[in-house]
Amino acid sequence: MQISTGGFILEDTAQYNVFYNLSKQVIEDENTPMRRFLPLVYEIDEVKDIDEEKNWIKANPSLYVVKKIEDMRENVEKMKMAPALKQTVLTKDFNLLCNSATSFFDFEDVQVDPNEILAGVLEGKIYNTYGVCSFDLSNGGSDMSSASILVKKEGKMYCLNKCWIPASKYQMYKDWNLPIDIWIENGFMALSGTTAVEYQDIEQWIYDTCDKYSITCTLCGYDRYCSTYLVKNLEDRGIICDAAPYTTPGMSPLLYELRALLQDHRFIYNSPILKWCLLNCEVLTDTKLQVYPKKNVLKKKIDAMMATLYGFYAFRNHPEYENYLNN
């Protein structure tokens, strides 16, 4: 028997999601073969439900018995007066999983309506349309690289994403307790090369994905680093490649735009690696409230997010293509 409240999401985000989703599956599926596993999940449904005291017992079955209602009221008032306490109250008093206080995206931000990403639904939305490809390459291919394909349609942004690591890094990710085998099995990650990712694998994925869903990619956003080979090949195919400036003024509007779309449920994606990277994102904030993503934080990879942001840059930097990309 194991009892736990929610907590802050650190490097074990993906592992937590595996067990939480397993619990949800067992609860909802009467025909589950897991007869010796009985999950009991007490949580409030949404953050907004905290405003009504009658909802508090959902996450606190011992309220009025062990836990005092007066203490709960005091904590909620403290949270409203001091936003810095919000994450702690949400996790410890309402059993909502939250990201670390320094992270740019909240756990609630990155959730996607499961009906939007059912098999065939996401793919159906992006089929036979225009889109943007983008990628983020690691230093010499020695660690994770990522690519995204973005499609704007019906006021929403749809994203397909894949990541690659060299075989030499496989054990490192396993040691971090990440469900890397599940990611690979489900096609969200692939091993490429022995000590360095082979960039032609990324290039081929872009071509294959566009062919599979009849997507016409007219633009590509990317980081200049180590990109010469891939950019040349894409440009030879008539794709306009635009390097995103990795600066605070360059990154800040992209991060705010992505967060706004997520909070408005208009950014649709199905990659658990992209979710992990979003939750890993920590930012530096300047006096103008511009934000800049911190890179090279051990165990907090953000490559899938960066690849996606470069696609946002291509959209933003080429408004003349908006008519094509919205159809």
Range-by-range predicted roles:
Residues 141-155, 304, 310-311:
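Acidic, metal-ligating active-site segments
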Residues 25-55, 233, 237-322:
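Metal-dependent DNA phosphodiester-chemistry modules and their immediately adjacent helices/loops
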Residues 64-76, 127-128, 157-160, 203, ...:
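Long, compositionally biased intrinsically disordered regions
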Residues 151-217:
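Nucleic-acid-processing active sites and adjacent nucleic-acid-binding tracks
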